[in-house]
């Protein structure tokens, strides 16, 4: 059975994501792209987020990849925005229902090779760029929770 959100075979995407998080937290060479791994995965798996959270993650990808902002710059910029006491929206979905209709992506986390840190960083970046390109075509009406 394929993942109903990204199309990866046998729902292996969550397993691979978990493995990659361990790799990124134990080896700085891999961890250098952690920000892209999480954002790309969350954009492809919209059931984990609210509509506002999904749009926020997509916008983060754009800031990282198009505007070339570093994670440190983003952290400073969004400090108050992501503070749960000050934030005006929730990230985590309470329903588990996807907020976008897309179920097939050109690339998934299964396209990422982890044989060494250099290849891994290149593949994560390519996957994140592909996700951003496809996600940029999705118009999300946050007020009505509909995709167009």
Feature locations, PLM:
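Intrinsically disordered, low-complexity linkers and terminal regions
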Residues: 1-148
């Amino acid at each position: 059975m394929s993942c109903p959100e990204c199309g990866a075979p046998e729902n292996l995407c969550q397993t691979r994501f978990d493995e990659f998080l361990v790799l990124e937290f134990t080896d700085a060479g891999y961890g250098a792209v952690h920000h892209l791994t999480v954002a790309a995965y969350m954009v492809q798996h919209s059931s984990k987020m609210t509509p506002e959270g999904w749009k926020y993650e997509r916008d983060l990808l754009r800031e990282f990849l198009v505007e070339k902002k570093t994670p440190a710059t983003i952290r400073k910029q969004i400090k108050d925005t992501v503070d749960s006491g000050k934030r005006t929206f929730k990230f985590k979905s309470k329903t588990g229902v996807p907020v976008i209709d897309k179920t097939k992506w050109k690339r998934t986390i299964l396209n990422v090779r982890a044989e060494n840190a250099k290849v891994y960083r290149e593949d994560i970046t390519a996957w994140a760029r592909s996700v951003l390109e496809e996600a940029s075509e999705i118009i999300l009406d946050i007020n009505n929770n509909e995709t167009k």
